[in-house]
Regions:
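Histidine-rich, glycine-flanked metal-binding segment
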Residues: 1-33
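Divalent metal-coordination and catalytic microenvironments
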Residues: 2, 7, 29, 40, ...
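Catalytic beta/alpha-barrel core
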Residues: 195-199, 217-226, 246-251
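His/Asp/Glu-enriched, well-ordered alpha-helical/loop segment
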Residues: 48, 55-68, 193, 235, ...
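Polyanionic/metal-chelating signatures
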Residues: 80, 85-218
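Metal-associated gating/positioning segment near the N- to mid-region
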Residues: 27-95
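Glycine-enriched alpha-helix->loop->beta-strand junction motifs that scaffold or abut catalytic
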Residues: 211-218, 235-242, 270-272
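Hydrophobic faces of well-ordered beta-strands that scaffold small-molecule active sites
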Residues: 37-39, 92, 126, 194-196, ...
Length: 301
């Protein structure tokens, strides 16, 4: 028997005494598991992938959107939420998509279960996209994309040092809006983690090295198709990874090292990881499927 109070398992045992007003659910011969958390989806921000007017997850015509907050656009009545909860997903990290800026904005945490407050946390992380196709947002080169990301952090440091002068317009002009500067300052100071979407092993090394210059910055890698190649480095630097093991095809030159057993290789190297679906469009069930594939490829229960 399981006793659940306010969504929390409070007691496990045989023939537990009933409580007044308790609701009984017969789950005989069925497995019981904690709710899944999707660590990267856009449920509540988009309804139809090909219909732009139904998508609120990206900001275009702006070359810096670090201050973009997705929680302000969330739809708690989205038609995709019941699908997620039916697939066993009880919480989701709702992430911004890259528009015209490599810094896409700030993600939010929501809860998909009925009777609970939908928005759990307004700001969870800042998201930076440095994949193969993302370099176009910074002039077409990976070098300029990473350099621009670092330069933005440095500008946030200057803002912190000269905030009074900024408010009185007495200092050298800033390239970024104040909302972006405040958002990046929180990243630099470790108040908000930085999630970097990157796939190629060579790029992962450069990202880890570059952002390692900020001792308080909390780095997380997402996608990270070739993270298994640099797993010892990630273990030493204590950098967690968000992965989708079902994306195991070499779809571009950044993903030539894609493989089904990445979760096993990361676990064996001592790297912390979590699964994400990456898409809300009937893909939520892939979260548990990915976990099953990982176990089939050698990951322990």
């Amino acid at each position: 028997d399981l006793r659940v109070e306010d969504g929390i398992i409070t007691e496990i045992g045989a023939d537990l005494a009933s409580s007044p007003g308790a609701t009984f659910l017969d789950g005989e011969n069925h497995p019981v598991t904690a709710g899944f958390i999707d660590s990267g989806t856009t449920i509540g921000l988009a309804e139809v992938s090909g219909l732009g007017i139904s998508r609120d997850g990206e900001q275009v015509d702006d070359d810096m959107t670090a201050g973009f907050q997705v929680y302000l656009a969330l739809n708690e009545n989205s038609s995709l939420i019941p699908i997620a909860s039916n697939d066993g997903i009880t919480r989701g990290l709702i992430v911004p998509e890259a528009g015209d800026s490599n810094y896409a904005g700030q993600s939010a945490l929501v809860r998909f279960t009925r009777g609970a407050a939908f928005l759990q946390q307004q700001t969870v992380a800042q998201h930076l996209y440095l994949r193969e196709g993302d370099r176009r947002r910074a002039g077409g080169s990976r070098s300029s994309a990473l350099a621009a990301a670092l330069e933005a952090l440095e500008e946030s440091a200057r803002y912190d040092e000269q905030r009074r002068a900024f408010n009185t317009n007495k200092n050298r002009a800033f390239n970024l809006d104040e909302s972006d500067l405040i958002a990046l300052s929180a990243v630099r100071l470790g108040k908000v983690p930085l999630v970097v979407q990157v796939d190629r092993a060579a790029d992962i090394i450069k990202v880890v090295t570059a952002f390692g210059a900020y001792p308080r910055l909390r780095l997380i890698l997402a996608g990270a198709t070739e993270a298994w190649k640099v797993a010892p480095l990630l273990n030493v630097e204590n950098i967690p990874v968000l992965i989708n093991v079902m994306e195991n095809l070499p779809q571009n030159f950044d993903r030539l090292g894609a493989r089904l057993d990445q979760a096993t290789l990361l676990a064996d190297a001592g790297v912390r990881f979590a699964f994400f679906s990456g898409s809300p469009y009937s893909e939520t069930r892939s979260l548990s499927q990915a976990a099953g594939i990982a176990v089939a490829q050698g990951l322990s229960w």
